[in-house]
């Protein structure tokens, strides 16, 4: 019996013994080197560094070929599911190498002309875009939001590849992120599109991101005719028809759908308003049938999301304000950047929250500054991620105004900036 069990264990694949480690290789914009040559050089680099600790980035290389052609080699996303960085034995892992170059052209506008009106219907990026480089890493969440979203899209690709019967098992390729303003929902959608374009670069040559302008889409101009909506989605269909492209359609503030429906029911808008909303839902139903499209949507007002749209979403993820632990990570990344740029000088080592926990939050010369940052993080709870990323700038502008500052001085300024932010918030709410 034991022998049979042993044979069975050998026959079954053991995923845990050979985890996949994703390595992103940013090729220089002017480089014309072949991907196979870059791949060989990167493998040699990785073979020389068998053990790494969590995510790791190389920007300087002994190999002249890599120096000429590669801007960075990054071991990424190892910390998405693990609470803390873990040592990784690269020799025991399956390496997934993703080589890419950034598109530096910036967004273009998709215009729709209606008589004399020139309506900007959407913004369009070719991915991976220089504008979104580093955005994924800057977003910090308390739950495994990023890993769940990555796994979701990878599963849609797998099910499509295996020709799973969608009549038996349904999936719509629609993601809905909802929560209060300033929590990074739109940024996460853009970062996800960028990340997946890189992750699937061996399958799709490039990505396309279309951000639909909801405010224009549901204005009186668009409400006059569903034909314009059809025309806009036809442009999107043209992009989807290129099977070398992975297409992301981003609809921000999707609660506008509900606003248009309710206005029509109340008699405040012409009947065309309901037709334009139905046209959008119909077009979404048509494009989601294609295997190379993902529809990303956001909403600031959870209770007002149209039920017809909610039913279409495979994932409905709430994105709330960051906790003190997430705020600590956000501030820590800001301080690291300011030390790198020598605005905070001299550089000093800060402990992570996990390291503070391991020493029982005891104050000493090593932990003093990190404990102060932890205290500032706790009193910052209630502020949005958008505000938190602005606070280091405001701290410098309001309380420092010098080319460089010590970390002690900066933390004092940051604490004052947090206090001021809450004071202003209180004053504003008094007038609402």
From Swiss-Prot:
ATP binds at residues 179-186. GO terms for cellular component: male germ cell nucleus. Disruption phenotype: Mice develop normally without obvious somatic defects but males and females are sterile due to meiotic disruption in meiocytes. Homozygous mutants display small gonads and females have few or no follicles, due to oocyte elimination between pachynema and dictyate. Mutant testes display reduced populated tubules and spermatogenesis is mainly arrested at spermatocyte stages of epithelial stage IV, corresponding to pachynema. Different phenotypes are observed in the different knockout experiments tested. Keywords: Acetylation, ATP-binding, Differentiation, Meiosis, Nucleotide-binding, Oogenesis, Spermatogenesis. Widely expressed, including in testis. InterPro entries: AAA+_ATPase, ATPase_AAA_core, ATPase_AAA_CS, ClpA/B, P-loop_NTPase, Pch2-like. GO terms for molecular function: ATP binding; ATP hydrolysis activity; identical protein binding. The keyword 4Fe-4S does not apply. The keyword Acetylation applies. The modification N-acetylmethionine is found at residue 1. Gene3D superfamilies: P-loop containing nucleotide triphosphate hydrolases. One of its GO terms (biological process) is oocyte maturation. Pfam families: AAA (PF00004), AAA_lid_TRIP13_C (PF23242), TRIP13_N (PF23563). Signal peptide: none annotated. It comes from the Eukaryota. Plays a key role in chromosome recombination and chromosome structure development during meiosis. Required at early steps in meiotic recombination that leads to non-crossovers pathways. Also needed for efficient completion of homologous synapsis by influencing crossover distribution along the chromosomes affecting both crossovers and non-crossovers pathways. Also required for development of higher-order chromosome structures and is needed for synaptonemal-complex formation. In males, required for efficient synapsis of the sex chromosomes and for sex body formation. PANTHER family: PACHYTENE CHECKPOINT PROTEIN 2, PACHYTENE CHECKPOINT PROTEIN 2 HOMOLOG. Belongs to the AAA ATPase family. PCH2 subfamily. Specifically interacts with the ligand binding domain of the thyroid receptor (TR). This interaction does not require the presence of thyroid hormone for its interaction. Interacts with proteasome subunit PSMA8; to participate in meiosis progression during spermatogenesis. This is Pachytene checkpoint protein 2 homolog. The gene is Trip13.
């Amino acid at each position: 019996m034991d022998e049979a069990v042993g044979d069975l264990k050998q026959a079954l694949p053991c995923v845990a013994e050979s985890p996949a480690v994703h390595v992103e290789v940013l090729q220089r914009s002017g480089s014309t080197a072949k991907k196979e040559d870059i791949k060989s050089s990167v493998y040699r680099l990785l073979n020389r560094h068998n053990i790494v600790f969590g995510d790791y980035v190389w920007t300087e290389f002994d190999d002249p070929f890599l120096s000429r052609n590669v801007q960075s080699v990054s071991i990424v996303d190892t910390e998405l599911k693990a609470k803390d960085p873990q040592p990784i034995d690269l020799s025991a892992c399956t390496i997934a190498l993703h080589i890419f170059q950034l598109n530096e052209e910036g967004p273009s506008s998709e215009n729709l002309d209606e008589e004399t009106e020139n309506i900007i219907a959407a913004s369009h990026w070719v991915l991976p875009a220089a504008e979104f480089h580093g955005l994924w890493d800057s977003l910090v969440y308390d739950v495994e939001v990023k890993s769940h979203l990555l796994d979701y899209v990878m599963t849609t690709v797998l099910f499509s590849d295996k020709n799973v019967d969608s009549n038996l098992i349904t999936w719509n390729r629609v993601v809905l992120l909802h929560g209060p303003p300033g929590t990074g929902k739109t940024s996460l959608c853009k970062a996800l599109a960028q990340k997946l374009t890189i992750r699937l670069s061996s399958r799709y040559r490039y990505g396309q991101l279309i951000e639909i302008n909801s405010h224009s889409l549901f204005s009186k101009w668009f409400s006059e005719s569903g034909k314009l909506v059809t025309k806009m989605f036809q442009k999107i269909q043209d992009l989807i028809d290129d099977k070398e492209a992975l297409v992301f359609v981003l609809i921000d503030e999707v609660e506008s759908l509900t606003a248009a429906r309710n206005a029509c029911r109340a008699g405040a808008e012409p009947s065309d308003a309901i037709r334009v909303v139905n046209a959008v839902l119909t077009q979404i139903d048509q494009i989601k049938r294609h295997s190379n499209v993902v529809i990303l949507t956001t909403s600031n007002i959870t209770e007002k999301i149209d039920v017809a749209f909610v039913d279409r979403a495979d994932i409905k993820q709430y994105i709330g304000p960051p906790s003190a632990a997430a705020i600590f990570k956000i501030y820590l990344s800001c301080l690291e950047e300011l030390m790198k740029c020598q605005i905070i000088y001299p550089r000093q080592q800060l402990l992570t929250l996990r390291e503070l926990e391991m020493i029982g939050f005891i104050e000493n010369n090593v932990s003093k500054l990190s404990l102060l940052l932890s205290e500032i993080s706790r009193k910052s709870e209630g502020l949005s991620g958008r505000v938190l990323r602005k606070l280091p700038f405001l701290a410098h502008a309001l309380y420092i105004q010098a080319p460089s500052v010590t970390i002690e001085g900066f933390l004092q300024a940051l604490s004052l900036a947090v206090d001021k932010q809450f004071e202003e918030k209180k004053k504003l709410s008094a007038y609402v």
